[in-house]
From Swiss-Prot:
Transports acetate. One of its GO terms (molecular function) is symporter activity. The lineage of its organism: Bacteria, Pseudomonadati, Pseudomonadota, Gammaproteobacteria, Enterobacterales. It is found in: Cell inner membrane. It is a multi-pass membrane protein. This is Cation/acetate symporter ActP. Belongs to the sodium:solute symporter (SSF) (TC 2.A.21) family. One of its GO terms (biological process) is sodium ion transport. It comes from Salmonella typhimurium (strain LT2 / SGSC1412 / ATCC 700720). The gene is actP.
Length: 549
């Protein structure tokens, strides 16, 4: 049986977070009717929520931010639902299954960005912005150039993420459900468009909340059954896992999947700052009523995600013990059926039988839908709010802006389906690494410095932001993943897998240098306006009305 090549998570954690990208050849599985029935129940229920939400979406604020009426707890669950992808579940547990302790290190890597969001970004972002993070970046800077840069940064991240999600969705569904790849991609695209088109942020939020609850329940049940098997003793769990794993005691120590310190540092910075620059995550902070609820959102989201990653660690060791040692889950060559990414799915069957296997498969599909819905809404708002209403057609009515947003949703949906089909047999795992690098090198520096550095000017933000974005793209192309593995050259021009360390440095240095040397009258005026922005960012004065651009 052909192996499913794991997502980049099998060796590199960027994809474990977000790609859901199972790249390579997939042998279609028999149709899993339990999974299909459970998934249909989920779809019918969420379409009902979309219909309910569509009756409550009456304005631009309702469509983009659910009217700002989501509570901190609900938003925390939704953020967790937006951030915990199917490959977080499958990829991290697969990494633990193959490498043990390394999987825990990487799962913690996905959490380190959240304290930055909590302490540095959440409160000021909510007090200064209205619908998108470009509202914050352009608060005292020149609207046109900054919004174009922010929208481009957002759209590139969204596009790369969407392609990775769509290809991963098709491969995953082909594997779990036995459905044809093209049918799976079209199904995800159509459902994604329906959620966002009719229900906006309100429907997207509730799809993400439901998915988060289902995923946390499923993972909790699996972890509980694993611990029950070993008498609720971690000592027994680790001892039994070491006894059956080919690496033996080596799974309890770091194995050095990232070989050199530069790559490790670059990877860590990309994960940490990339999270704080993802447009679909930042957009969620505008769905709550005030800065206090925004802080609570991050607090709850971090708690849910931390709990989830602890569960994946237990699930990974449970898979070593109950799946790795069971010949029923191996093919003729002795490899795991479906590849290592399927370790958690096989464990679901081992601890809960066919019915629970169907449930976990349906949850994996629901997870992809929740993530792509959030991405699509972020992309649509960048086009309609940042570009159309504030650059190309200033003074556009709410109705016109919403019309453009919905057209963008349709266009993004169709493009995502087409690219999902075209990239079926391509290695798309690098796209998520590139998305994170761009978010960390373009979006994050501009957001952070616009809120904290009084001497920032439009010239500095523009030149530094574009330099960061282009450096990330160029270094990724010249690196080992694209230059050698995809383009087929013998040796990479840029030797490191991850460009974040270098591209983030270029962005911050560029922003600092071009702002510090900007002696124009406009630059001086922008510096003087920082005090008013600072007061607004601290007090939230005027936040209910938002800033009229």
């Amino acid at each position: 049986m052909k192996r499913v090549l794991t997502a980049l998570a099998a060796a590199l954690p960027f994809a474990a977070h977000a790609a859901d990208a199972i790249s390579g050849a997939v042998e279609r599985q028999p149709t899993n009717w339990q999974a299909i029935i459970m998934f249909l129940i989920f779809v019918v229920f969420t379409l009902g929520i979309t219909y309910w939400a569509s009756k409550r979406v009456r304005s631009r604020s309702d469509y983009y931010t659910a009217g700002g009426n989501i509570t901190g707890f609900q938003n925390g669950l939704a953020i967790a639902g937006d951030y915990m992808s199917a490959a977080s579940f499958l990829g991290i547990s697969a990494l633990v299954f193959t490498s043990g302790y390394d999987g825990l290190i990487y799962s913690l890597g996905f959490l380190v960005g959240w304290p930055i969001i909590l302490f540095l970004i959440a409160e000021r972002l909510r007090n200064l912005g209205r619908y998108t993070f470009a509202d914050v970046a352009s608060y005292r800077l020149k609207q046109g150039p900054i919004r174009i840069l922010s929208a481009c940064g957002s759209l590139v991240v969204v596009a790369l993420y969407l392609i990775a999600q769509m290809v991963g969705a098709g491969k995953l569904i082909e594997l779990l459900f036995g459905l044809n790849y093209h049918i799976a991609v079209v199904l995800v695209g159509v459902l994604m468009m329906m959620y966002v088109l009719f229900g906006g942020m309100l429907a997207t939020t509730w799809v993400q909340i439901i998915k988060a609850v289902l995923l946390l329940f499923g993972a909790s049940f699996m972890a509980f059954m694993v611990m029950k098997h070993v008498g609720f003793s971690f000592n027994n769990l680790f001892t039994e896992a070491m006894a059956v794993h080919p690496k033996g005691t080596a799974i309890m120590s770091p194995g050095g999947l990232v070989q050199d310190p530069i790559s490790a540092l670059s990877l860590g910075l990309g994960l940490m700052f990339g999270t704080a620059g993802l447009p679909h995550i930042l957009m969620r902070f505008f769905t709550v009523s005030d800065a206090r609820e925004a802080r609570k959102s991050v607090f709850y989201a971090t708690g849910f995600m931390g709990y989830f990653y602890i569960l994946t660690f237990i699930i990974g060791f449970g898979a070593i013990m109950l799946v790795g040692a069971n010949p029923a889950y191996k093919d003729a060559a002795g490899a795991l059926i479906g590849g290592n990414n399927m370790a958690a799915v096989h464990l679901a069957n081992a601890v809960g039988g066919n019915l629970f296997l169907g449930f976990i498969s349906a949850v994996a599909f629901a997870t992809i839908l929740a993530v792509v819905a959030g991405l699509t809404l972020a992309g649509a708002s960048a086009v309609s709010h940042d570009l159309y209403a504030n650059v190309f057609r200033k003074g556009a009515t709410e109705r016109e802006e919403l019309k453009v947003s919905k057209i963008t949703v349709l266009v993004l949906g169709v493009i995502a389906i087409i690219l999902g089909v075209l990239f079926e047999n391509q290695n798309i795992a690098f796209m998520v690494g590139l998305a994170f690098a761009i978010a960390a090198s373009c979006n994050f520096p501009i957001i952070l410095l616009s809120m904290y550095w009084s001497k920032l000017t439009t010239r500095g933000a523009m030149l530094g932001g574009w330099l960061g974005l282009l450096t990330a793209v160029v270094l990724m192309i010249l690196g080992p993943t694209i230059w050698v593995q995809i383009l087929g050259h013998e040796k990479a021009i840029f030797p490191y897998e991850y460009p974040a360390l270098f591209s983030i440095s270029v962005a911050f240095l560029g922003i600092w240098f071009f702002s510090a040397t900007d002696n124009s009258a406009e630059g001086n005026r922008e510096r003087e306006q920082f005090r008013a922005q600072f007061i607004r960012s601290q007090t939230g004065f005027g936040v209910q009305q938002g800033r009229a651009h």
